[in-house]
Structures are given as C-alpha cells and as structure tokens.
Amino acid sequence: MSFLANLFGAKNKYNDEQLVSQATKAVVADPLISDPTALVITSKKGVITLSGIVHKAQEKDRIEGVVRNSLKNAGLKHESFINELKLPHK
C-alpha cells in the first residue's frame, strides 16, 4: 500500500451496493430458487455473504452459481464469496 493509502485508509474498490443489488435481482429472477425472500445477501469490501435458509441442498450451490454468473455477466468484480446458506433443522 502507498503511504497515502496507509495514512488515509484504503478506498473500497468495490461497489458493495451495486454488488448486492445485482445479486439480489439475479436470485429473485431465477425460477428454480424456491424462496428468495428467505435469503440475505450482503457485501463488505467486495466480500459477498450469502445467508439464510434453503429448502434443498442443491439450492445452496445453485444460488451461489446464479450470483457469480450474474456479477460476471454484469462486469462487476468482487473479492470473494462466503456461502452461509443452511438447510432447515429437522
């Protein structure tokens, strides 16, 4: 990091609001995702976190794939993903 970046703090090079907006649109638009309202998508410094309850194990991977593809197609860069999606306890 440069001296000025260290002095003033590094600027976030990711648009977290735009990342969350694009990811949310993609999840809501996918008809194979059973309950997009049960999901929480956040981004902090380009680290996207997916959390909430999914109804099938396959849905966990699908959601991450849908979000990754959507961000790639929109030309939005991100740092990484944290997939904290869970199946309901029985």
Model segments located where?
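N-terminal targeting leaders
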Residues: 1-90
